Amino acid sequence: MEELCFDNQRIWFDPNLLQEDPKACFDASFWQQQGKVIGSAQGRGTTWFVQGETLPMALRHYRRGGLFGKLIEDAYVFTGWEKTRCAEEVALLSTLAVGGVNVPRPVAARATRHGLVYRADLLVEKIDSAKDLVDLLQQAMLPDHVWYAIGRTVRKMHDLQVCHTDLNAHNILVDSRELVWLIDFDKCYTQEGEAWKAKNLSRLHRSFVKEQGKRNIHFSATSWQVLCQGYELPDN
């Protein structure tokens, strides 16, 4: 990653992935004016999907959730550039990618300081042909080898001592090759020890049960059993 420092901003970017102007690429209007917006998704604000010169990307502005987010929508206390949410997520994604976990490649990040607080943006690779696991499970039951692959992917993440604080079915993608991807590592971190891993896995199980009741997804005790086999057993 290269780094730009100017005025009240810090920008990190990968010159091999980003051919556009790093100072302009975090504004949705920049992409709209070029006709390069290829989609969007709603969550905490809008995630814009844009077509860059080298690859499709997802552009996200960091926003708070919950009650506090209604009071202070997108400002965070500044304690150092490397401790900003965007810088930490870029570092974590890089660690996971090097460790063999399928995650979006970080393209660029920007932190803008305003006195005691800052705001942040992130640009990551958009995974080609990948779909939200919940969307897929609403349509049909997945074959066992995909459930197994989900378990293996989570295990690889845990073996790198990375705790995904929002590990749920929506943050798992499956592409057209049936490769499993993990996304949305905001507020995630590395953690020593082993005890937390079972709790993290239980969190994922609760999300499947929740979506089964809410959206009637195709999920069963057998599905979870195969996922756990993938988590517990070594690769063949």
From Swiss-Prot:
Transmembrane segments: none annotated. Keywords: ATP-binding, Cell inner membrane, Cell membrane, Kinase, Lipopolysaccharide biosynthesis, Membrane, Nucleotide-binding, Transferase. It is an enzyme of class 2 (transferase). The active site is at residue 166. It comes from the Bacteria. Its EC number is 2.7.1.166. It catalyses: an alpha-Kdo-(2->6)-lipid IVA + ATP = a 4-O-phospho-alpha-Kdo-(2->6)-lipid IVA + ADP + H(+). Pfam families: Kdo (PF06293). Its main location: membrane. It is found in: Cell inner membrane. InterPro entries: KDO_kinase, Kinase-like_dom_sf. Pathway: Bacterial outer membrane biogenesis; LPS core biosynthesis. One of its GO terms (biological process) is lipopolysaccharide core region biosynthetic process. It is a peripheral membrane protein. One of its GO terms (molecular function) is phosphotransferase activity, alcohol group as acceptor. Catalyzes the ATP-dependent phosphorylation of the 3-deoxy-D-manno-octulosonic acid (Kdo) residue in Kdo-lipid IV(A) at the 4-OH position. Belongs to the protein kinase superfamily. KdkA/RfaP family. This is 3-deoxy-D-manno-octulosonic acid kinase.
